[in-house]
């Protein structure tokens, strides 16, 4: 009995000693490696192929800034959206950049930082195919096809609000956008900024029936479960750069201007 108590006490003390070291592993690995591995997916204007190679966008600027503040360089790994959370869980990346929507379901698998920004779901419609549609309720019909991207929050919005419509989920935004542009879908639901840019670039064929989000949401960064030290650093980073308005200025550049369009590969 005495031996058992001694063993239990030793294990308890060992857990106390090891725990801080285990929590610091992610940051230690990043610093020792010299790179912060950032998971991104291609959505306008979060991450887009650049003319000079690599990617540009809001998420890219965030990843680069975080890495510089850590004294390392950013290494971007591009995934289809459905694969980005599994990549984080598998340890292929250290974090997911700022376009991921906070949901309770996702929080069971990954850990979110404090919110980086607020946004919401928007809808683009094919002008010719919806010329007789007068309200959103008319789009909730079995004859209506709505395009989305698999495993995005927007897909859930589409299936929830337009439960009678035929929902076509695509592995990437290019395929989803092509479907509405080619007249094979009546509407496309994605983040409001993404559909706004799609409409701006295709105003002869695509319309924006609503200027406000269908549903609002909060966006954050994400890390693996249990990486408390990295989470603490990122929360502090968000607080600091909200205070100095770097985050506001960066979001204004990517979401409210078009100055960056010359950087994007066509």
Predicted features and spans:
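Periplasmic-binding protein-like
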Residues: 118-124, 192, 196-238, 257-266
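Ligand-binding clefts/hinges and TM-proximal coupling segments of bilobed small-molecule sensing domains
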Residues: 153-167, 208-210, 238-266
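A local structural motif
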Residues: 64-77, 143, 159-171, 184, ...
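Extracytoplasmic small-molecule ligand-binding "clamshell" domains
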Residues: 24-100, 108, 169
């Amino acid at each position: 009995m005495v031996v058992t108590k001694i063993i239990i006490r030793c294990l308890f003390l060992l857990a106390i000693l090891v725990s801080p070291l285990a929590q610091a592993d992610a940051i230690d690995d990043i610093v020792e490696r010299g790179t912060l591995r950032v998971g991104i997916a291609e959505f306008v204007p979060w991450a887009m192929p650049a003319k000079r190679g690599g990617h540009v966008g809001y998420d890219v600027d965030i990843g680069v800034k975080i890495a510089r503040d850590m004294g390392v360089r950013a290494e971007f790994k591009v995934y289809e959206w459905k694969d980005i959370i599994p990549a984080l869980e598998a340890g292929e990346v250290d974090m997911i950049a700022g376009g991921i929507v906070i949901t309770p379901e996702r929080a069971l698998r990954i850990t979110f930082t404090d919110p980086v920004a607020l946004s919401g779901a928007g809808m683009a419609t094919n002008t010719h195919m919806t010329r007789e549609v007068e309200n959103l309720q008319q789009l909730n019909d079995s004859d209506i096809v709505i395009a989305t991207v698999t495993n995005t929050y927007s897909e859930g919005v589409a299936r929830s609000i337009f439960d009678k419509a035929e929902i076509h989920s695509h592995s990437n935004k290019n395929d989803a956008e092509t479907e509405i542009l080619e007249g094979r879908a009546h509407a496309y639901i994605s983040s409001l900024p993404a559909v706004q840019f799609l409409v701006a670039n295709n105003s002869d064929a695509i319309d924006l029936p609503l200027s406000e989000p269908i549903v609002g949401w909060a966006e954050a960064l994400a890390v693996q479960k249990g990486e408390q030290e990295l989470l603490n650093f990122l929360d502090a980073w968000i607080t600091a750069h909200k205070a100095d308005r770097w985050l506001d200025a960066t979001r204004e550049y990517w979401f409210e201007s078009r100055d960056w369009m010359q950087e994007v590969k066509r």
